[in-house]
UniProtKB/Swiss-Prot annotation:
GO molecular function, one term: ATP binding
Protein name as catalogued: ATP-dependent protease ATPase subunit HslU
GO CC annotations, alphabetized: HslUV protease complex
Organism: Bordetella avium (strain 197N)
Taxonomic lineage: Bacteria, Pseudomonadati, Pseudomonadota, Betaproteobacteria, Burkholderiales
Role noted for this protein: ATPase subunit of a proteasome-like degradation complex; this subunit has chaperone activity. The binding of ATP and its subsequent hydrolysis by HslU are essential for unfolding of protein substrates subsequently hydrolyzed by HslV. HslU recognizes the N-terminal part of its protein substrates and unfolds these before they are guided to HslV for hydrolysis.
Family: Belongs to the ClpX chaperone family. HslU subfamily.
Main localization (coarse): cytoplasm
Gene3D superfamilies: 1.10.8.60, DNA helicase RuvA subunit, C-terminal domain, P-loop containing nucleotide triphosphate hydrolases
Single GO biological process annotation from the record: protein unfolding
UniProt keyword annotations, A-Z: ATP-binding, Chaperone, Cytoplasm, Nucleotide-binding
Amino acid sequence: MSASTMTPGEIVSELDKYIIGQNRAKRAVAVALRNRWRRQQVADPLRHEIHPKNILMIGPTGVGKTEIARRLAKLANAPFIKIEATKFTEVGYVGRDVDTIIRDLTEFSIKQTRELEMRRVRSHAEDAAEDRILDVLVPPARNAMGEPQRDDGNTTRQTFRKRLREGSLDDLEIEIDIAQATPQLDVMTPPGMEEMAEQLRGMFAGLARDKTKPKKIKVKEAFKLIIEEEAAKRVNEDDLRAAAIANVEQNGIVFLDEIDKIAARQESGGADVSRQGVQRDLLPLVEGTTVNTRYGMVRTDHILFIASGAFHLSRPSDLIPELQGRFPIRVELDSLSADDFVRILSETDASLVKQYTALLATEDVQLAFTEDGIKRLAELAFSVNERTENIGARRLYTVMEKLLEELSFDAGASSGQSVTIDAAYVDAQLSEAASSQDLARYVL
């Protein structure tokens, strides 16, 4: 089921599989996604006036802000890009300007649309690839124009077609004309001029288009290459670009991470010279403007922006007022408790417990985590967070890696063993590091 047709409740249920708690953030994101679908159902004059309500997520590091965006990207069948606000500088300074956000989003949409189109024409491309390989194996008669006159009733051709489909010819080497690969050209340009580099690459790529050369290759590999080639022939580039740009304009989502890092603090000095400039450059993008990309003009009026930040050293009110007004929905994410850590380790679909169990199972080492073992692991991770820097759920990675360090190193020699990870095992491996503040700071 596509996220565009899912109800907010279904979207939240899907996010619950990977993210514990943070219901307010999940609900806000789910409603924003559903509003996309609702807007499409509204009649045209009013539909154009309905703009997405951008979201600002506020919360400490490691509580799920980025994970919500990452899972949303997989869930939403829409152009999506996650970028760090700190990568951009004010126009005129060395660095990337904010328009590259929309250019990158358009590139993603072109790639996504091309993949969909290639899948749509794949069956026709497979038939054409089959015929081209059979033309080499059983050369047909040719007309005055040199075009093959295929006789599908030919018994020999049908025999080879059957063998080709069965895979018995996969290792046979044939010589066939294959389109030349586009030369990879690396263009060095000053920061902020990436668009010029893309145009130069496109220009040189066009020079090698439609050129073929004979190549000796196995039937199996030839079949894959020719399918790609034939599918590309059947995709109309102009229609593809128009569809991709429309998809960006109507369904695009930009996740703007670390926005707190470009909020100028009142007491800060000259080091923040370009921070307010970046905020001012973001204003028209978030409000609605037209950005020139190499595929055409892209309007940003209906692109959804989701910003997030920890706001440890600054506050949302430190953002310039105009930008604050462009993010009307504000959601605070909660710090994680020890109980949340237990749920993260045991309830999520791709929990660390499942990941490490699967990894060591490849070496025939069977891990079994008990409830008290998981609880003790969560308590230690929470305790280290309380006494040192609070990095949220990311602390579980460090603690789990330290816990299984010896086991992972000796896994090859321990093949066939079963190891139970209970509270006693966790204490034996981690209690010393967790109890010493210095060790906890540098080891965990």
